[in-house]
Amino acid sequence: MANIIKLGSLYLDDCPADTEIVYNSGQAIRIGEAVPGKEISWVVVNNMLIADRCILTKISWDNLKANDLVFGKEVSIGGFRFTVRLLQVGAEKDEPNEWDAALDAVGEDDSIWHWKDAYFWVQEPGKIGSSRYWGSRSSGYRNASLGFRPALVPLNTKHQDEIRIGEQLRLWGGQSIVSGRLEEISDYEMVLSDWDGTLFGDFGSRISDGRIVIDQGAIAGAQRI
């Protein structure tokens, strides 16, 4: 089962843009605050967020590198900090990689990942259709079926804006995602009321009066809602 979150928007030359559009060489690319109707959809998986589709097409690896989007740069969305970057898949075909790990965790269904006829750049040079096919192209290569599927990796929440009692939050970690009203917070736990979402593993547990307690150490990211 995949959990999807809408977070942030794509900007081209500082203008909010739709996703799945053709890139014009030379445009400045960034991911920033969400604009209604132009939000990016992300799959919550393995303590990170991976775009559920290519958000730009006909873009080269060199174009992405010129915008510091290959190996990662820091962005702030909704008061929280992330590194936005390409996925890591390893230099050899049989090496463990983040894409395979994501497919193993939530499944390969095209309705989740929109991978059919939509290849994407990764950090490493590779060696085509199943969801796990990989190949290689020169860094300057551009094609309408080859695009930019970013990943967001949450940074340490201790350096983010203060979270206050009474705020409506969405918290995620692993494959778990929950939202609710923050009732209590400590160095070790958060307690939410009026919550909904999906719990897996040791992320959290249900307590009295329809509340849940979340292990602070299991939280990978947060969003005010």
Protein language model features and the residues they cover:
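Intrinsically disordered, low-complexity, charged/polar segments
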Residues: 199-225
